[in-house]
């Protein structure tokens, strides 16, 4: 037993450290707390994969322990029949080749099925008209455009529950990634192209969204709130915003192209009449030049905003959400 303990000691220590670090990272496991059908499918797939792999690891450790105990060197053991010269075993070679292939197939089938099913609206609400939202990443903020409602928000998003949301994702500059963990997985945002993603919230609440792809100095601050409300409350917000929020001018939208953090903003018109970032990958750079922004090294003492002229824009209390 002492020999067995010494042999397994490194593995036991590694297992203990793994448990400590894994549990330490589960304080806010929002991915495993889904609030919509898309996130629920992905969470189920993650748990299935983890359970399947833990089973495989368990089998390996059991076999490893049996071999250690059964074939260990001990006093009185007859080693006369032992032959260290082994030149292959067809049966074993077939087994350890076929088993990994079967494992990969077993994991691939549900994974591929889930990935393809997520490219469509959730099954439970596929007959409902999706709410279309253009999500545009700009260093370091998120701009959300509602073309049907002619509304645009910055750094927050209002959506109705029990209705599919079709995101049209793009970027004005750096390659980013839209991620709302409790509603679904991340999808890349790239300049000059649109990526579609269906998400849906089933419960009223506020969910955290963020950029999941590093984009520079203030990447960690590129977050936004997703407010999932009832259809009635959503329609009330739309009506109030259309009547009370200011229009989005081209000059103001150009200012949003500057690489900086801003507060939540609300407008009663969208930037879609000025530019389609899914087609125009240069608009942000041109807007910065028009405003006098000079890109410099992050180690430089020069202020890149030194020559920038901006129109001060103050949100009214009525438009703050």
Swiss-Prot record:
Pfam families: COX2, COX2_TM
Lipidated residue numbers (S-diacylglycerol cysteine): 26
Native species: Bacillus subtilis (strain 168)
Lipidation (N-palmitoyl cysteine): 26
Gene: qoxA
InterPro entries attached to this UniProt entry: CcO_II, CcO_II-like_C, Cupredoxin, CuRO_UO_II, Cyt_c_oxidase_su2_TM_dom, Cyt_c_oxidase_su2_TM_sf, Cyt_o_ubiquinol_oxidase_su2, QoxA
Subcellular location: Cell membrane; Membrane raft
UniProt-recorded name of the protein: Quinol oxidase subunit 2
Functional summary from the UniProt entry: Catalyzes quinol oxidation with the concomitant reduction of oxygen to water. Major component for energy conversion during vegetative growth. Subunit II transfers the electrons from a quinol to the binuclear center of the catalytic subunit I.
